[in-house]
UniProtKB/Swiss-Prot annotation:
One GO cellular component, as annotated: cytoplasm
GO terms assigned for molecular function: rRNA (guanine-N2-)-methyltransferase activity
Organism of provenance: Shewanella piezotolerans (strain WP3 / JCM 13877)
Enzyme class: transferase
Protein name, entry field: Ribosomal RNA small subunit methyltransferase J
């Protein structure tokens, strides 16, 4: 067990470095528990609200009530559709992390966000340790994992393959690996990158998410610790217009319609 880390099931929690004020119904014990667990401070003037309805924890931007709340759902909706019909190991992300016949790497997702890329990799057989530094996002991820672990269809392999570590990626990538007790083949990074000014059609959900967490202005500092941790490769997901992370040219690039995967190879993937 890593010093300063609480391990509860598959959730690893370090004291948050981000002080976050949030609004929630203080008469609701579930929300009180979430706030205490993740170090969230109640404020009646907070920009965001946490709600718990129909067994789902959601985040709402209070000054834009028409926007749909954000939650993490690994069981149904878009991620379930992608798991069933998304192209399997032929997907670009699978190629980027080195998934192939006889090779199923262990991955640290150093910038988990809402966990969608991590879930894709886990559904394809990878063991994935998600690292998320923002306490509100980590709370949403934990809630999504809770429901996924309980699901009759995916619960067994989700328990075995997906875990969450709360802490700053720059400081705690190695802590996450140590807590998991396994060698890390791949570190996957998808830092939040500012959208172009003309990009007015950013999905509403992403607008809410970005206004909560902001851009990862320290993203360049992720590459060095990621390279030190990964035994095989580091994969960085970038918008097609973004510069190389930390100005370092990747070994190879896998391009998609709007994004690209920059792959920094350290060693071959051997089955």
């Amino acid at each position: 067990m890593v010093m300063g880390v609480i391990i509860i099931g598959s959730i690893f929690i370090k004291q948050s470095l981000i002080v976050t004020s949030i609004f929630f119904n203080q008469q609701y014990p579930t929300l009180e528990s979430v706030a205490e667990r993740w170090g969230l401070t109640y404020s009646k003037d907070a920009e965001f609200e946490l709600v718990f309805e129909n067994n789902i924890l959601s985040l709402i931007k209070r000054d834009e009530p028409k926007l749909k709340g954000i939650s993490v759902d690994f069981v149904s909706g878009a991620v379930a559709h992608r798991r069933k019909f998304g192209g399997g190991r032929g997907q670009s992300i699978a190629k980027a992390v080195g998934l192939k016949q006889g090779v199923t790497p262990t991955v640290v997702d150093g910038t988990a966000g809402l966990g969608r890329d991590a879930f894709v990799l886990a559904s394809l057989g990878c063991k994935v340790i998600m690292v998320e530094r923002h306490p509100v996002v980590a709370a949403l991820l934990e809630d999504g994992l809770r429901r996924a672990y309980e699901d009759s269809e995916i619960g067994e392999w989700m328990n075995a393959r997906m875990s969450l570590f709360h802490g700053s990626s720059i400081d705690t990538l190695a802590d996450a690996a140590n807590a998991a007790g396994t060698e890390i083949d791949v570190v996957y990074l998808d830092p939040m990158y500012p959208h172009r000014e003309k990009s007015a059609l950013v999905k509403k959900e992403m607008r809410v998410f970005q206004s909560l967490v902001g851009a990862d202005l320290d993203a360049d500092g992720l590459l060095k610790p990621a390279m030190e941790l990964a035994s095989k490769r580091v994969v960085v997901k970038r918008p097609d217009y973004a510069e190389d992370l930390d100005g370092v040219k990747p070994s190879t690039v896998i391009a998609t319609k709007k994004n690209r995967f920059d792959v920094y190879v350290k060693a071959a993937m051997i089955s």
